[in-house]
Amino acid sequence: MTNIPFIYQYEEKENERAAAGYGTFGYLITRIEETLYDQYGVFYELYASDDPNTEYWELLVEDVRSGSLEPEHVAYIFEKLEKKTFAYDEDEKEPDYTVHKSIRNSVYAYPEKGVAFARIPYFQDGSIMSFDCLFAVNDEKMRAFLEGVRPRLWEKSKRKVTVFTDGDGGTSREQEAIVREVQRSQVIMNPLLKKEIYRSIDQFFHSDKSFYQTYDIPYKRGILLYGPPGNGKTTLVKSIAGSIDAPVAYWQITEFTSSETIEEVFQAARRLAPAVLVIEDIDSMPEDVRSFFLNTLDGATSKEGLFLIGTTNYPEEIDPGLMNRAGRFDRAYEIGLPDEELRLEYMKMRGFGIFLSEGEIKNAAKLTEGFSFAQLGELYVSSALQWHQEGNHHIETMVKDMTGEQRKSQRGSWMERNKVGFH
């Protein structure tokens, strides 16, 4: 369409009518329906949604931003509001600003699907809010459109990580691109433990539900990763996200986590199934909602098709009811401090060989007893910087300094071996 019409044209003498209530809303809906009829020759009816999940809007935004020809821009709504928007696109190899048609203040239609979208601005207390409307030619078109949303969302979600964060106003949901994939070969941990974890993941996603039905096993699994920070729990999760053909969702537990946010997250995660749901810092679950969380896990369909991965740095804070029970967390794995062999493997992979000989790397691996992978990473950065600036290194001195700092900062006994109750 070259000449895109306006639903509500501005006139000075009518500006009071633009701020009215139902009268203005009824006028706008009528004009939208008339404009759709004029364009396509069929009547589009307004539908209301009782579903808090509105993924179809995400797909519309993606189509508009990508320049897809499938959604047609039918009309603007208010003449004096925005027609275009800009955003910083972090998903591109070279992030930059993009300019695209506005979703708000516009009417879009998928004529072949028989549905249309309108994000209508309204004015309240000096602010501009918006009201989302969905139109369809008939119930059959609406059902067919909604049935097609989930497969497309599932494919879209495989390319990104869906991040749920519980905040003061409820759960926010964003999709973040996997900027740097981690290969399984880059995960350094006990070989037997690594094999067992990946095998359980692969069994879940590479077999269909018939295996679970045949052996009467719930099609829902869960593992808990625990241990001191900086030892590869996050790296392991990233490698899983980049190596399975399924969506991965990430849920950050906070003090704002409530029964409402728990229900909202699981409802959204079920729509992505089969999928992985990573629950970060599960020990931070507020005490007053832990029973609700356990009941949600026990629900007949609450986790169908979901592989749960819980992570914690403080396993002693975990509710014992979570563990060793089918449908909750079936297994717990300690991701502990690396031994000398693993430290040596990490240091070789990280690139210490650029400025250290083979013998010096082996010696550094011995000296760094008690170091986490994160601390070894810090040691690499410091050593590389010194090598670049001075042409030499004093890695033994650096290790000694870091060891002293580590001893000063350590607190509590949970990091000590044989103090954790999960085996």
From Swiss-Prot:
The EC number(s) this enzyme carries = 3.-.-.-
GO cellular component terms, alphabetically, are: cytoplasm
Named from the GO MF annotations, one term is: ATP hydrolysis activity
Keywords, alphabetical: ATP-binding, Cytoplasm, Hydrolase, Nucleotide-binding
Q: Cytoplasm among the record's keywords?
A: yes
> Which SUPFAM superfamilies does the record match to this protein?
P-loop containing nucleoside triphosphate hydrolases (SSF52540)
InterPro entries listed in its UniProt record = AAA+_ATPase, AAA_ATPase_domain, ATPase_AAA_core, P-loop_NTPase
Q: What class of enzyme is it?
A: hydrolase
For region Disordered, the annotated ranges are: 403-423
Q: Induction: what does the entry report? A: Expression is sigma W-dependent. Induced by alkali stress. Strongly induced at the end of the exponential growth phase.
Q: Which positions are tagged coiled coil?
A: none
Where can this protein be found? Cytoplasm
Q: Which Pfam families match?
A: AAA
The lineage's top-level taxon is: Bacteria
Which amino acid positions bind ATP, per UniProt?
227-234
What functional role does this protein have?
Shows ATPase activity.
Give the family from UniProt.
Belongs to the AAA ATPase family.
Protein name per its UniProtKB record: Uncharacterized ATPase YjoB
Task: State the organism named in the record.
Answer: Bacillus subtilis (strain 168)
Gene giving rise to this polypeptide: yjoB
